[in-house]
Amino acid sequence: MLDSAVLDYEIARQKATLDALPILADIARADVIYYDLLSSEQIKVLCHAQPHTVVSIYAENLKGTIHRLDKDSVLGTALLNGSRGRGTLPERNSNSQAHQEVWPVRDYMGKVIGAISIETSDTERASYRHRSVDSEWRDL
């Protein structure tokens, strides 16, 4: 059984993480999704922070939805093996792809309890690269 101080700490830590995701979505100009691992086959979206700075790659917010976990996906690898990774997804609102970066979230004992996925459209990724090149030229 968990000590009440440890439990309080874990709850506060998860709340702080979830509270920070909307800010991260705007700064990253990407959808940021926190997935909770329900079982080895199911995940639930605890938080879906859609950016205000660009158009979301999802037509609707995914918060509260339950999905089957694809064990071979980047998300599956993060949740089941504890490894962060990158991959591509078909973008929901167009014919292009979205880029996904996933980090596992661990509890105080190091057990993977969820994952944070940052999902960026091809368009926004290209725009970021363009802004980065422009910034390098200004520094010369």
Annotate each predicted stretch with a short phrase.
Residues Q14, Q42, Q50, Q97-Q100:
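Residue-identity detector for glutamine
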Residues Y9, Y34-Y35, Y58, Y108, ...:
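Sequence-level detector for tyrosine residue identity
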Residues M1, L46-P51, I113, S117:
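Short, compositionally biased low-complexity segments
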